Design a protein with these regions (language model features):
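Short glycine-rich, Thr/Ser-proximal phosphate-binding strand/loop in the N-terminal lobe
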Residues: 23-29
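Conserved beta-strand scaffold positions in the cores of enzyme catalytic domains, especially
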Residues: 28, 79, 140-142
Length: 170
């Protein structure tokens, strides 16, 4: 089974104002000492896990050139421009349509472009475990933190945990 990645990079970065602006949102900014942007760090983090030709970037049409400049290794046809920004579900749907048109049987990992991940080794282990679970059947696997309260800006999934969770920070 093929593993693909969809990186969501269409946000305007409004919650990160004033550092982030509509013409240069958070995912295209360098917020760490190494000078790499958030989206570059995301691609770098998954590059040992997913072939670069199977990495898709879903973004706003206004950010297409920024994606091309910052991620020259991503095939141009893998830069998916959302016709209208409508948040996560339509973005994931757009990516799923493109992956399904290329592969009959694939796992699609969906990642935000602007998360700060401090432990890449734990991230990679978690990524591999999630892919393995997804490959075992028609499974939706989510990875995240345990929320303290519902937040409409991020969504909320209520789950029943049948297996113990791994309490390692990523």
């Amino acid at each position: 089974m093929k593993t693909t990645a969809l990186i969501m990079a269409g946000g305007k970065g409004e919650r990160f104002w004033p550092k982030s602006r509509v013409n240069m949102p958070k995912q295209f900014l360098s917020l760490t000492d190494d000078g790499k942007t958030m989206i570059q760090l995301t691609v770098e983090r998954i590059s040992p896990l997913v072939d670069i030709k199977d990495v898709y970037i879903a973004t706003n049409k206004n950010y297409r050139e920024l994606v091309k400049q910052q991620l020259p290794g991503i095939p141009e046809e893998n830069i998916l421009c959302e016709p209208v920004g409508r948040n996560t579900a339509p973005c994931v749907g757009l990516g799923a349509v493109h992956v399904a048109s290329k592969y009959d049987d694939a796992v699609m990992i969906v990642l935000p472009s602007d998360h700060l991940i401090k432990n890449n080794e734990v991230f990679a282990d978690t990524f591999k475990e999630a892919v393995q679970i997804a490959e075992e059947g028609a499974n939706l696997v989510t990875v995240g933190i345990t929320p303290n309260y519902p937040e409409t800006g991020y969504g909320l999934s209520l789950i029943h945990i049948s297996e113990p969770t791994r309490p390692e920070p990523i």
